Regions:
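Glycine-rich adenosine-cofactor-binding loop
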Residues: 1-13, 17, 22-25
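Conserved nucleotide-binding/hydrolysis micro-motifs of P-loop NTPases
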Residues: 3, 27, 64-65, 92-95, ...
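Short amphipathic alpha-helical segments
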Residues: 9-10, 34-35, 69-73, 98-101
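Short, well-ordered coil/turn elements that cap or connect secondary structure elements
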Residues: 15-17, 36, 82, 103
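Adenosine-nucleotide cofactor-binding segment
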Residues: 17-47, 67-68
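Short, charged, surface-exposed secondary-structure boundary motifs
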Residues: 31-33, 52-54, 116-122
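Rossmann-like NAD(P)-binding element
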Residues: 39-73, 78-88, 92-93
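Adenosine-phosphate binding glycine-rich loop
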Residues: 74-149
């Protein structure tokens, strides 16, 4: 429910994501963000149980260490019976133990992963822009040659 959490929640809602489940150590902050995004607020103690029923969980706390440990997630995943779970860890230090990404049907992304994905996408876009420039230059030259007497 900090600045990052608010920005992410609003961005997801603006892109059509369904109902958000919001939690915070401070209940009033969770309630305010849930109301602003037409979501549901839950107590901070209940977040592990919610992992059993969501498809994506985004962590962005200021906790001094990992909140989600591999043993906890292993139990969650057993109860999910193979349903995939996408975990996005925006926290520094990380909220999710790296070993969680090694569990079956868990897809864990952290800031470094997201940065690498964004950089690759930017590189691909720049490559396509260059292809378009070359195609436009070729067509402009062809058009100019046709106009010459």
């Amino acid at each position: 429910t900090g600045e990052i959490g608010q920005d992410v929640a609003r961005a997801l809602r603006s892109r059509g994501l369904g109902r958000l489940v919001v939690t915070s150590r401070r209940v009033e902050r969770a309630a305010a963000l849930a109301a602003a995004t037409e979501g549901d607020a839950i107590s901070f103690e209940d977040w592990p149980a919610v992992l059993e029923r969501v498809g994506v969980a985004i962590f962005a706390t200021s906790a001094p260490g990992a909140l989600l440990e591999v043993e906890t997630l292993r139990g969650v995943m057993e109860r999910r019976r193979g349903d995939p779970l996408f975990l996005i860890d925006l926290a520094v230090p990380r909220d999710i133990e790296a070993a969680c990404g090694g569990l079956d049907s868990v897809f864990l992304y952290n800031l470094e992963d997201l940065t690498a994905i964004a950089n690759e996408n930017r590189r691909l876009r720049e490559s396509e822009i260059e292809k378009c420039r070359l195609a436009l230059a070729e067509r402009a030259e062809h058009f100019w040659l046709r106009l010459r007497p």
